[in-house]
């Protein structure tokens, strides 16, 4: 579960079709997770953005925007009944868990809610893309793959 659509996702009407989606696809493959077995969605259903010239840049959603999308998120989870949800980023984790969390403080731990028996928190693929250097990006990718492997093992 991502945080919110990005520019390309907003235009396409499909989550994870932009650069972060490519990072996620590569990480899923490296973790041995078949894309066909994964349901991708976002916690916040609209793209909040700020204009920068001709570009639309991501802006962090407010708590009220996260809460406004709760009914859709709860409906998705109640219908899908996933065994595991991987929250990509702190905004997605807050939406699923109903409280503020940090990726660093919760990565690697199995959490739960009344709708999902196992919740994992990891970095959003866009954070990997924004890393300052190649070594940081490689470290971020390796952590994402490890987190996805852990979640996949729990789903079995």
Where are these regions (language model features)?
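A polyanion-binding, active-site-adjacent surface
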Residues: 1-156
């Amino acid at each position: 579960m991502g945080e919110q659509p990005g520019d390309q996702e907003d235009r396409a009407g499909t989550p994870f079709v932009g650069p972060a989606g490519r990072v996620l696809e590569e990480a899923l493959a490296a973790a041995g997770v078949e894309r066909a077995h994964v349901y991708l969605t976002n916690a916040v259903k609209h793209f909040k953005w700020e204009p920068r010239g001709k570009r639309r840049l991501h802006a962090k959603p407010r708590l009220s925007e996260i809460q406004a999308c709760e009914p859709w998120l709860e409906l998705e989870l109640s219908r899908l009944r996933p065994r595991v949800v991987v929250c990509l980023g702190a905004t997605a984790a807050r939406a699923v868990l109903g409280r503020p969390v940090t990726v660093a403080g919760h990565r690697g731990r199995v959490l739960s809610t009344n709708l999902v028996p196992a919740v994992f928190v990891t970095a959003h693929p866009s954070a990997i893309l924004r890393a300052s250097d190649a070594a940081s990006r490689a470290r971020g990718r390796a952590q994402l793959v490890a987190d996805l492997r852990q979640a996949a093992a729990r789903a079995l």
